[in-house]
Amino acid sequence: MVLCCFVALLPCSAQSGLHINQLFEGKIVPKRQMVETLIRGKAISKYKLSYFHSVRFKADEALVKKIDHLIVRDFVNDSEKLKDRQPDSRGFYHSDSMKKARGRKLFTQMYELAPHGSTNRYLCYKVVDDVMTVIYLEGTVSSLEELKEIFK
C-alpha cells in the first residue's frame, strides 16, 4: 500500500514535450482502462535506468496505428538530434520485430530519442494479440542493443 502511494506521487513530466505524452496523460485511452507503472531511482538503477513509465491496455488495430504514429512523430522530430549518437550495429536508431508463438502474435518496436543532457531516452512498445504496452525509459543505457539485452 505504501509503495502504491509512493508510485502515485512520482511526477509524470519526464516525457513531457513528446506527442506520446497524450497517451500517458489519459487523453487517448482513459486512465481507468490502463495499467500504469512508474518506477524511479534505486529500484531500476542496476539496469542503468533512472526512470521507467509504462501503460498497458487493450488496443484494436486502429488504436495501435494511432499510437504508433505518435511515437514515430516523436522519433522523427528527434532524429536530427541523433546525428552525434552511435547507431546500432545495423546503422539504426530503432528496432522492430514480429513473431508468432503458440498461436499468439507479438510485435515490438524500440526507438532511441535524443538525449536530455547526459540522460538517454527510449520509447518502446509491444503488442501481444490485442494488448499494447508502451514504455518510456530514461537512463545511462548507451544503445538500443544494450537496452535489448536488459529486456531479454
Give the residues covered by each predicted segment.
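Mid-chain, structured segments of secreted extracytoplasmic proteins
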Residues: 56-102
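A short, solvent-exposed beta-edge/loop patch
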Residues: 110-142
